[in-house]
Amino acid sequence: MKASELTEKSVEELNAELLGLLREQFNLRMQHATGQLTQTHQLKIVRRNIARVKTIITSKAGA
């Protein structure tokens, strides 16, 4: 997910994207805790995507 793609979305779409990412992060953490997650780098990717979305939401709210 690129930041340029996110800037084109509305705040409502970004909030929906954020909710989906938070759910995905929760599922990945549960898989990691139970030892079912083989691709642990997905946790890092999702965490950074959440940060990207939150940053764009904050910048749109301030503008």
From Swiss-Prot:
The keyword Iron-sulfur does not apply. InterPro entries: Ribosomal_protein_uL29, Ribosomal_uL29, Ribosomal_uL29_CS, Ribosomal_uL29_sf. It comes from the Bacteria. GO terms for molecular function: structural constituent of ribosome. SUPFAM superfamilies: Ribosomal protein L29 (L29p). GO terms for cellular component: cytosolic large ribosomal subunit. Keywords: Ribonucleoprotein, Ribosomal protein. One of its GO terms (biological process) is translation. It holds the Pfam family Ribosomal_L29. Belongs to the universal ribosomal protein uL29 family. This is Large ribosomal subunit protein uL29.
